[in-house]
């Protein structure tokens, strides 16, 4: 997912750069890039103009080789259409669907939360001074630090990125409370939806805590830079498409929970291979929580597909066309202007979270929600949305193969990128 979002953003940028090249070859390349974007579901607002037989100046080329359709008026109209599309989900009859599903949520979502006395806490997974005494705590910390020395920098960067994402929990609870019909309107509502939000937040809160404590004890990281990154991310917030629609929001969170489980699970396996059993246990425990949370959100979207299939599949297509924007996409350490892209590239390179994982998650959700089997109750728009979603994994697969082939032909070499989290040591990544 990280890789897909980064790739598509850079591809859009490349189209604009190519427009300044006063040759037909540049126009053809840019047209090919735009075509790839369109095939993947991301439309471009620009199209190539007809070329002249005489070679124009660079300035003239900038002005004439590409024409932007509709300019600002078209962009405003497009944004208005997008907003109108998802705002239709806020109609009373649509929100009543969620209100009627509250007893279902009570029976099928809340049981996936565990009582505080039954779940792990950070002190269960790390040395506890009160339990071990001064000498025992000191010895346990020395052992933890010795094992942490074996974890490569690439995995440390991915670990910090995951931890920063987890620590921005206040943003995610705020996001959940923007969903109409399911939000916690008073902060202490007794509805099943509101109790789920608070219970989910309580479980998620342990994830950033335990990772932060491990990092402090390990001595491998510049914790002040890590903490500044968390501070900036929470202050920056996050942007999500269709922010008030529970249909779109639940699709987004179902995808995100599975992505987080995959990322933490991969990290656990990798660091175990490098000898850090304590960190592997921590990441494995977090991944287990995320699997339960994924199950809850996957269930509620499956129920929406059952009771309102046309609206559900159109919401899914809407989100996939605009990409599942990562919650930590606005992360900033105050030094690297492209920090998230570099973190995403490190995750791709290390195999912690890859484009293939993004595709696999999409394929999994298509199966879980039986999207391919949808037929009855679909409008023409719903059928087109179904066909788009079901065709998307293969399009992503072809994009992966073409990107891999191009990289092999170009013999592209990794680029060393310094990360402030690890005292500006470089990590080699493949940049788009």
Report residues per predicted region.
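Non-heme di-metal
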Residues: 2-21, 29-33, 37-47, 54-55, ...
């Amino acid at each position: 997912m990280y890789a897909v979002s980064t790739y598509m953003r850079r591809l859009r940028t490349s189209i604009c750069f190519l427009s300044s090249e006063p040759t037909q070859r540049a126009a053809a390349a840019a047209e090919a890039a735009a075509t790839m974007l369109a095939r993947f579901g991301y439309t471009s607002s620009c199209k190539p103009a007809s070329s002249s037989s005489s070679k124009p100046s660079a300035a003239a080329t900038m002005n004439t080789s590409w024409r932007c359709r509709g300019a600002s008026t078209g962009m405003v109209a497009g944004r208005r259409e997008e907003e109108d599309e998802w705002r239709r989900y806020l109609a009373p009859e649509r929100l009543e669907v969620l209100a009627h599903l509250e007893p279902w949520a009570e029976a099928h979502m809340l049981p996936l939360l565990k009582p505080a006395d039954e779940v792990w806490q950070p002190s269960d997974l790390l040395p506890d001074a009160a339990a071990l005494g001064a000498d025992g705590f000191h010895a346990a910390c020395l052992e933890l630090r010795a094992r942490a020395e074996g974890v490569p920098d690439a995995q440390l960067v991915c670990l910090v990125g995951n931890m920063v994402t987890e620590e921005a929990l206040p943003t995610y609870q705020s996001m959940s409370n923007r969903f109409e019909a399911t939000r916690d309107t008073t902060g202490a509502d007794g509805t099943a939806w509101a109790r789920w939000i608070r219970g989910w937040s309580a479980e998620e809160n342990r994830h950033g805590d335990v990772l932060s404590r491990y990092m402090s004890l390990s001595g491998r990281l510049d914790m002040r830079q890590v903490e500044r990154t968390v501070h900036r991310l929470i202050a920056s917030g996050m942007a999500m498409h269709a922010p008030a629609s529970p249909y779109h929001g639940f699709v987004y969170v179902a995808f995100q929970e599975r992505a987080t489980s995959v990322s933490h699970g991969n990290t656990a396996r990798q660091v175990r291979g490098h000898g850090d059993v304590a960190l592997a246990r921590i990441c494995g425990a977090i991944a287990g929580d995320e699997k339960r949370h994924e199950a809850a959100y996957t269930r509620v979207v499956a129920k929406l597909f059952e009771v309102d299939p046309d609206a559900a599949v159109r919401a899914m297509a809407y989100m996939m066309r605009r990409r599942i924007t990562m919650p930590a996409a606005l992360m900033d350490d105050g030094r690297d202007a492209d920090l998230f892209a570099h973190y995403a590239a490190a995750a791709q390179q290390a195999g912690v979270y890859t484009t293939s994982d993004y595709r696999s998650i999409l394929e999994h959700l298509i199966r879980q929600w039986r999207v391919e089997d949808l037929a009855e109750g679909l409008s023409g728009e719903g059928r087109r949305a179904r066909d788009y979603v079901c065709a998307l994994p293969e399009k992503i697969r072809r994009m992966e193969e073409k990107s891999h082939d191009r990289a092999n032909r170009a013999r592209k070499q990794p680029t060393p990128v310094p990360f402030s989290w690890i005292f500006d040591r470089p990590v080699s990544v493949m940049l788009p």
